[in-house]
Amino acid sequence: FWIGRTKGVPVYEKLSYPLLLLSFFSLTQDWNQAYININYVGEFSNGFVPFLNSTFLTSLLCVALVGFINLLHYSKKYDRPWPAQKDLFHLISYGISGIFLVVLYGTFATEISNYWDQLLISTPVYNADLKIFKAIWLLNYSLLFMTALSFLNIIRLKNNTLAILSITLNILVLFAFLTVGLYGLSELRESYLGEGQLVPNEPGFYNISIRYISFLFVAMLLFVSYKYIKQAYVSVAA
């Protein structure tokens, strides 16, 4: 892609797009394989090291490469290979931007998921609370991710299409928290107050305190969503 765009060789850039798709699907396969290795193969039976494993490092490399492609693609310094085909340009723009966001989100979501999965299977006595913690922290991460994306668009990008997309996703994430999240938090509270605290792996105060962490993330997303609808460039009809 870099050669095609910066050196003005359109055929190279066109060839890079199927390679980008292939790399994306290969990465999703790596994520799936990491899940299998933890839950069925027991690859990390001696302990999973968050953010210091081959899957995470590979994902970071993909984030950097796809991010670099996006920077070149949106740079006005270089001409695109099909200047007259605006619809095709927009389609490609949505595609590579979407891939970047999915890879960026999935890189850390996979790490969070794998951490809690490994913790669950490594405990000598089954602890159902760990599955709930996994769901809650994936929701917390989603809330934080959407807050950061929305804030970046408000102060820097100011893109209407991204604004409509992120507002929609903000609503979906908040709905997920109000349904799955609140139910999970209530289950953790019941586990802390109930008979479960009399058995090994007894619930601790973290079962209660995590709700305040989640509420903070919810408040942040609500605030940035409110700021969104006040932006002049945000329009459904645009």
Language-model region placement:
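Alpha-helical transmembrane segments of multi-pass membrane proteins
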Residues: 1-238
